[in-house]
């Protein structure tokens, strides 16, 4: 889990727009966040396997 202070800091509006960054809404991870879901790759994988993300399927080719 991310530190609560860093999660709160990310939620605040920054002084300059370029300083804003995305964090996972579920665990607070700052890297590898999917904008479409607002989740990190790990949480997307866990939720997709559990069937909690509608419209997401395991690819096969």
UniProtKB/Swiss-Prot annotation:
Names of the cofactor(s): Zn(2+)
Cofactor remark from the record: Binds 1 zinc ion per subunit.
GO cellular component, one term: small ribosomal subunit
Keyword line: Metal-binding, Ribonucleoprotein, Ribosomal protein, RNA-binding, rRNA-binding, Zinc
Disulfide-bonded cysteines: none
Keyword Zinc carried by entry: yes
Gene Ontology biological process terms, A to Z: translation
Residues annotated as binding Zn(2+): 24, 27, 40, 43
Listed SUPFAM superfamilies: Glucocorticoid receptor-like (DNA-binding domain)
Presence of keyword Metal-binding: yes
A GO molecular-function descriptor: rRNA binding
HAMAP family: Ribosomal_uS14_2_B
Function: Binds 16S rRNA, required for the assembly of 30S particles and may also be responsible for determining the conformation of the 16S rRNA at the A site.
Subunit field text: Part of the 30S ribosomal subunit. Contacts proteins S3 and S10.
Family to which the UniProt record says this protein belongs: Belongs to the universal ribosomal protein uS14 family. Zinc-binding uS14 subfamily.
Protein name: Small ribosomal subunit protein uS14
Protein species of origin: Rhodococcus erythropolis (strain PR4 / NBRC 100887)
Organism taxonomic ancestry: Bacteria, Bacillati, Actinomycetota, Actinomycetes, Mycobacteriales
Gene giving rise to this polypeptide: rpsZ
């Amino acid at each position: 889990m991310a530190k609560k202070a860093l999660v709160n800091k990310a939620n605040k509006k920054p002084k300059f727009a370029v300083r804003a960054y995305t964090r996972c809404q579920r665990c607070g991870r700052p890297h590898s966040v999917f904008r479409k879901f607002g989740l990190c790759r790990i949480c997307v994988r866990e939720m997709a396997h559990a069937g909690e993300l509608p419209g997401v399927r395991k690819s096969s080719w």
